[in-house]
Amino acid sequence: MARIGLGDGWKCAFANDFDPVKAATYRANFSDAADHFHERDVWTLSPDDLPGRADLAWASSPCQDFSLAGARAGLTGGRSSAFFGFWRLMEALDDAGRAPRLMVVENVTGLLTSNGGADFAALGTALAVRGYRFGALEIDAATVLPQSRPRVFVVAARDAPANLIGESTFHTRAVRVAHAGLPDAVAAHWIWWRLASPPARNTDLAALLEPDDAVIWHSAAKTQRLIELMTPLHRARLETRSSRAVGAVFRRTRIENGRSIQRAEVRFDGLAGCLRTPRGGSSRQAIVVVEGGQVRSRLLTPREAARLMGLPDSYRLPATPTAALHVAGDGVAVPVVRWLARELLEPLLNPAAAMAAE
């Protein structure tokens, strides 16, 4: 999805994923995959597998990949995580004089706070030691898509033109706290990247849904069971709708009176909740439609999930719903990548053109 977001102006020289479902999906959507895609554990790759010197290296990995277990072993030691496997390659490229001009590390917002901020500091230290300056931006896909999906984008570069440094709404409180927790030697490499806010989102969840007669709805009994999982506050949200309303429902585990209780929570703000990889029916997001005093419910379809990630309907999804939702729920929002590329990454690669355009 990062490749689609970057756009046709970029050429992908190398891509890697160890997940067979994601690998098959990549091949199905990119006819040139055989030229550069490697379906392998990142730890089995060598610098010789990466051609030339890239303008950009992009890494998306689970938050737990920044575990201190990897840092304690040294950033080049042990098969601790996908990220450290990636970083081992970046170090080797740097040693060979082929370090990427830019890097982006994309992750969940927990990266900023995990292990009391020590994991974020470990990432910053790794970048700083190799001569990169870096800064973090917390961007919620809800700025451009009807899905609440906050993510952190750590952007690293060897040079930082003055016109790309400044204030940004994406310097959230969490980013500022993470920055404040960096060791002084690492903080000296920090950059407050200037990134403008994109135009206001002009679509909502209902606009991306498939027609009512093209989807499978829950039985009345199943819908009632879903409603019974709601607290009085959330049931009231259903009951107070006076006209057709479309909402998103997540099942969550809440602690109530010292016990773990499964709850269904509904929102009618035009946004879906953050898509997740499915681990059974309870983790799949549901849709409710309230109309004429009646409530209907169903599961979000794979195509709807893909639309919530900004993917075109021409994007080929895996055949099974579970696999398709896994691909969508583990991806990066396409329009967010495009905005980041247009407003920051591309100007970093061509600062003269960026300054002339201002």
In which residue ranges do the predicted regions lie?
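Short acidic, glycine/proline-rich loop/turn micro-motifs
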Residues: 6, 68-72, 287-289, 321
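Conserved proline-anchored active-site loop of SAM-dependent methyltransferases
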Residues: 1-3, 41-42, 52-70, 102-108, ...
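SAM cofactor-binding core of SAM-dependent methyltransferases
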Residues: 1-43
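Class I S-adenosyl-L-methionine
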Residues: 1, 8, 47-54, 68-267, 355-358
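C-terminal target-recognition/interaction regions appended to catalytic cores
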Residues: 212-358
